[in-house]
Amino acid sequence: MAIFDRFTKKGRKKMKKASNIITIIALVLIVALIGGISYGYYKKATMEVKNPIVTMEVQDFGTIKLELYPEMAPQTVSNFIALAQNGFYDGLKFHRIVEGFMIQGGDSNGDGTGAPKLSNLGIDVKDDEDRDYCIKGEFLSNGYNKNTLKHKEGIISMARADYTQQYSKSLTTESYNSAGSQFFIMTADNSSLDGYYAPFGKVIEGMDVVHNIENVEVKETETSSSSSSDSSKSESKEKSTPVNDVIISKVTVETYGIDYGKPDTLETWNYYDWVYKTYGINLKQYQQ
């Protein structure tokens, strides 16, 4: 009996020692695991995420580089990148240039009346389902308060329509949410635009190119522009159309591996539908 007790005590002592060693090893592994996870989160949190960089090549003028700010206007940035990646801007013009104010481009019609289609975003749609689209205006007057960018020299912002000037004061929301593909680059500060248009980036190289474009010879416009960077200047006879075309030969975007996706699209406002809904007049029947 004494021999058994002695053996049992020794066995228990060895087992306890082994258990302590296992516990220590387990604790070391847990600490290492927690440390690794914590470092991973720290690295992710502190890792510099580069903003997308736009390279805009303008024929006979040079290259403009812009940094986009997705944290300020995510839908606007997503929209611009998707259009650029699908070659939408290649070959379009700066169709509206106002010295001391801005240069405007990105219209498929080349006169301010065009709109992008869903297919221009790289969305796979059937021909009979492809349609013009617009995006929500990411600025204060439209209920969006995360965009704190100001319309300073070098800022790129979205042009939009102002139906309140042309048709009815009731069309404020439709006006605010009418931007599609047209953009403008500020050549001077203009605080009157703050809170009413969606700035989403800034020129970081080639501001001299922007100013050279700003100084080209211009003539009176031949048509009213549906999308503008200044509603008070959207009527015809504004002297802002370049005598010689200023062509955007190519636009590329370096996203540094980040996928900015596609923007949430809205249906464009339709004048004929609005007239019918408001006044009960079907103008479509008079179209040829």
Regions found by a protein language model. Give the residues of each.
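Cross-family detector of peptidyl-prolyl cis-trans isomerase
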Residues: 2-288
